[in-house]
């Protein structure tokens, strides 16, 4: 929950914004939920796994972009009549995802990155699509902040029914002896997995 919400914060999503969340694993799904709570208008979610697609719709996605159906930038530009989106939250993908994010972003737009980019020497930013440095396209990224007050705010969303995280939990285990099994699920990522939970 905290990391996905931080993606929406980094992107500075405001009411009425058109937003694209790239990647709809657990973090991206919570980014979708956060963008919806912040009042996003048209909310695109990029992903392909059926259970994640259904969860993205549940959390507020208005449009699903399946990267297996073609280039995601072309799909976004087609859907927006060539305009692109106001904000992008990067919650998945690889180093080339930034090329896509910058390209689909409107001038003056903002990218919030919460995806760990652990390989490669450089992140490429396309010059023309970035407006040759004059397009006022902002990229913000970082670890999610911690702290008691922040966690209390997030918990209040659960407490008062503004956020339901149950759609994330696809595999439930009872007892510490199942910890390894749950961790292996996260490593292997079967198609029906979003997030496992072990109740101690």
Show the residue positions of the predicted features.
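Mid-domain Rossmann-like dinucleotide-binding core that forms the NAD(H)/NADP(H) cofactor-binding site
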Residues: 1-70, 74
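Conserved amphipathic alpha-helix within the SDR
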Residues: 72-82
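Short SAM/SAH-binding signature in class I
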Residues: 83-89, 109-110
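Beta-loop-alpha module in the N-terminal Rossmann-like domain of NAD(P)-dependent dehydrogenases
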Residues: 90-100
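C-terminal hydrophobic helical "lid"/dimerization subdomain
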Residues: 99-103, 147-200
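Helix-to-beta-strand junctions that scaffold the AdoMet/dcAdoMet cofactor pocket
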Residues: 105-107
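Rossmann-fold dehydrogenase core element
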Residues: 109-110, 125-168
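Acidic carboxylate diad motif detector
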Residues: 114-115
């Amino acid at each position: 929950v905290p990391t996905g919400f931080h993606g929406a914060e980094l992107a500075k999503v405001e009411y009425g914004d058109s937003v694209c969340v790239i990647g709809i694993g657990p973090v991206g799904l919570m980014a979708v939920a956060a963008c919806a709570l912040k009042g996003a208008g048209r909310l695109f979610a990029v992903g392909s796994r059926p259970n994640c697609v259904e969860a993205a719709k549940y959390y507020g996605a208005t449009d699903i972009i399946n990267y297996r159906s073609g280039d995601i930038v072309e799909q976004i530009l087609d859907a927006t009549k060539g305009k692109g989106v106001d904000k992008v939250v990067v919650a998945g993908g690889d180093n080339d995802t930034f090329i896509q994010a910058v390209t689909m972003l409107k001038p003056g737009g903002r990218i919030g990155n919460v995806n760990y980019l652990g390989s490669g020497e450089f992140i490429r930013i396309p010059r023309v699509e970035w407006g040759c440095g004059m397009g006022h396209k902002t990229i913000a990224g970082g670890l999610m902040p911690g702290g008691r007050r922040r966690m209390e705010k997030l918990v209040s969303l659960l407490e008062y029914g503004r956020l339901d995280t149950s759609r994330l939990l696809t595999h439930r285990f009872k007892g510490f002896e199942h910890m390894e099994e749950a961790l292996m699920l996260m490593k292997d990522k079967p198609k029906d997995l979003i997030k496992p939970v072990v109740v101690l």
